[in-house]
Amino acid sequence: MLIGPLKREIDILTSDECRKLMKACSQKAPTGIRNQALIVVLWRSCLRIQEAIDLSPKDVSSDSIRVHSGKGERARTVGLDPESSAVVERWARLRQELGFKPSQRLFCTLKGEPLETSYCRHLLKRLAKKAGIEKRVHPHGLRHSGAVHLLDEGHNVVVISQQLGHSNLATTNTYLNHLKPADVVAAMQT
């Protein structure tokens, strides 16, 4: 019997590590402000990288994001907390000041071209190094981290599943099953 390749365990970032990642972005350069917004959308809204880079400005409101190109072509609306909304709004205002057209993607280069997934992966790796984060940081890891943080904050698994765009709760449970053996042992000691 053939066994497929082992899946690499996803490193879950703490909320503090996610914030460090955002702080590693330039606080003044347009690309830094854009990158902060991209990180917060991947992390707090739990979007897939392609869903995030496919967003247009009209897809984002003060409390939600409308995803049109979800996996399996299923559209959905996800929530956006006030703190994250402020970060995204800052980028939305700046991109308007820079003269970007509403028809251009929300997350684009300074020339108005859509971001590439490979660029985003490289960007997160570079920012993680700058922030002193030793864990493997990548777009899907931010999505997983966001889901775990939502659970830690007391959100219902059904709500988290809808945020993630999963059609099956079992898929969501694999995202949330990130307990380390030491955590399980410690829980049994109380």
Give the label of every model feature segment.
Residues 1-190:
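Conserved catalytic core of the tyrosine transesterase superfamily
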